[in-house]
A protein has these predicted regions:
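Core segments of cupin and vicinal oxygen chelate
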Residues: 11-13, 20-73
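Vicinal oxygen chelate
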Residues: 1-12, 15-25, 53-58, 79-166
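Acetyl-CoA-dependent GNAT
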Residues: 70-76, 146-147
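Short, charged, solvent-exposed linker or helix-capping segments at domain edges/interfaces
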Residues: 65-68, 78-82, 153-156
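Alpha-helical elements of the RecA-like P-loop NTPase motor core of helicases
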Residues: 30-31, 104, 141-142
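Short beta-strand/turn micro-motifs at beta-sheet edges
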Residues: 5-8, 77-83
Length: 166
């Protein structure tokens, strides 16, 4: 190995880039995430082990955070026999909404589709107003309002945060 990258653009420091989930049907999962979140398909692929897809926020090309979905073909799961357990009930992906009404709207849509897991409900201050929805594989996605993530990050780290040390 030469240490050379196959890509022209990459991070200058260790950077949070993705979370990966095993799914039963990558196409159904893409459709669900595009219907219930702001994520959009960035790339898809297939190899001898299965199918995959990358979804992300198209408004953040300079600091992408990607949801990787992987569907393994029968007998081709490189992690077998370990089971792929869904995230939940506490483990979840969090999306902060701009308003309480936005949380109510997604909760109503999820309830109509049969995938509302919790709420909407007002939780303690550091959690905010939330609902939990379930993807086709049972993974939990939280929509919240007023958690204060943006405010706390700017308060502690400022707009020009120092790079993390590795």
């Amino acid at each position: 190995m030469t240490g050379q990258s196959n890509h022209a653009v990459g991070p200058k420091r260790p950077t949070w880039t993705h979370i990966a989930l095993a799914v039963r049907d990558v196409d159904a999962s893409i459709a669900w995430y595009e219907a219930f979140t702001h994520l959009r398909l960035l790339a898809r692929g297939e190899d001898a082990d299965g199918k995959n897809a990358w979804l992300g926020d198209p408004t953040q090309p300079d600091s992408p955070f990607i949801l990787v979905l992987g569907q393994f073909f029968e007998g081709r799961d490189p992690f077998a026999p370990a089971p792929h357990l869904p995230m939940g009930p506490f483990a979840h992906m969090g999306i902060e909404a701009p308003s309480r009404e936005a949380v109510d709207e997604i909760a109503a849509r999820a309830k109509a589709a049969g995938c509302l897991g919790l709420g909407p409900v007002q939780m303690p201050k550091q959690i905010g107003y939330v609902c939990f929805i379930k993807d086709p594989d049972g993974n939990t996605v939280e929509y919240s309002f007023d958690q204060g993530v943006y405010e706390k990050a700017r308060e502690v780290w400022g707009r020009q945060a120092q790079p993390a040390r590795v």
